Amino acid sequence: MPKKVLTGVVVSDKMQKTVTVLVERQFPHPLYGKVIKRSKKYLAHDPEEKYKLGDVVEIIESRPISKRKRFRVLRLVESGRMDLVEKYLIRRQNYESLSKRGGKA
């Protein structure tokens, strides 16, 4: 079975030899057909610590490196897409403010 290869944006590089990659996907709703966006964060192994916040990277499935790390960074696709990171941070900030007030996201 081939290994999964995903493309996403580095949203955190604060850990040693690890980056957090946000992968967004789109798919049509099974009944209504509306295109839905979903995102997921993956921890990826970066042994040389060369990928920075905002980089668009490809990650590939690998052996388990730690409890949550199951991917490693394959290559850099595009450098410094800070607009995508800012959009993610604003969305996260809005979600946190709603959860503090007791509202639903």
UniProtKB/Swiss-Prot annotation:
Disruption phenotype: Increased generation time and a temperature-sensitive phenotype. Keywords: Ribonucleoprotein, Ribosomal protein, RNA-binding, rRNA-binding. It comes from the Bacteria. Disulfide bonds: none annotated. GO terms for molecular function: rRNA binding; structural constituent of ribosome. GO terms for biological process: translation. Transmembrane segments: none annotated. NCBIfam families: PRK05610.1, uS17_bact. Part of the 30S ribosomal subunit. Contacts protein S12. This is Small ribosomal subunit protein uS17. The gene is rpsQ.
